[in-house]
Amino acid sequence: MAAWGRRRAGPGSTNSGGGGRERVTLSSTDCYIVHEIYNGENAQDQFEYELEQALEAQYKYIVIEPTRIGDETARWITVGNCLHKTAVLAGTTCLFTPLALPVDYSHYISLPAGVLSMACCTLYGISWQFDPCCKYQVEYDAYKLSRLPLHTLTSSTPVVLVRKDDLHRKRLHNTIALAALVYCVKKIYELYAV
């Protein structure tokens, strides 16, 4: 875990604001940098290998200098986030539409939304769930980025990944998609069995 934090200013401190920020060094297990160093024809393969090793080693921060691999990784994470959010929002729409619309019309919105939620959840489960990249998010916060040793990089636009626990996120979209599935099966049974 990163060794950064806020410390209160003591009585002998010159900071009159009551709280100052101090920089503390990161340990070597917190941050890994995939440097953009071209050594031969297989440089891209080497970058991909280094990134894969860093993801599997579960570093807290991963800085990706090579633009192509950084952009691909950021897009992959963005697509996974989109699938997650779509599964949650569509499932929520499926479950709450019957409460907001008349019974005769609610299934025209809730059933497609439920199917969309289940499809996104299934696709996420197949393509992203076991990928080590799904444990990371792209960091955009300037303050958090200022804590990292980015001054040593040769690239002006590195992609910075931060490891985050996604257990609650997966539970949320799986629970909502499962509830949407139950609702859809029940509603289809009611529509066609009666």
From Swiss-Prot:
Region (Disordered): 1-23
Bilayer topology term: Multi-pass membrane protein
A GO CC term assigned to this protein in UniProt: mitochondrial inner membrane
Cleavable signal peptide: none
Keywords: Membrane, Mitochondrion, Mitochondrion inner membrane, Transmembrane, Transmembrane helix
Name this protein carries in UniProt: Transmembrane protein 11, mitochondrial
Subcellular location(s) of the protein: Mitochondrion inner membrane
Source organism per UniProt: Gallus gallus (Chicken)
Family label: Belongs to the TMEM11 family.
Keyword Transmembrane part of the UniProt annotation: yes
Keyword field contains Protease: no
Main subcellular location of this protein, as a coarse class: mitochondrion
Annotated function: Plays a role in mitochondrial morphogenesis.
Transmembrane segment boundaries: 88-104, 111-128
GO biological process, one term: mitochondrion organization
Superkingdom as given in the UniProt entry: Eukaryota
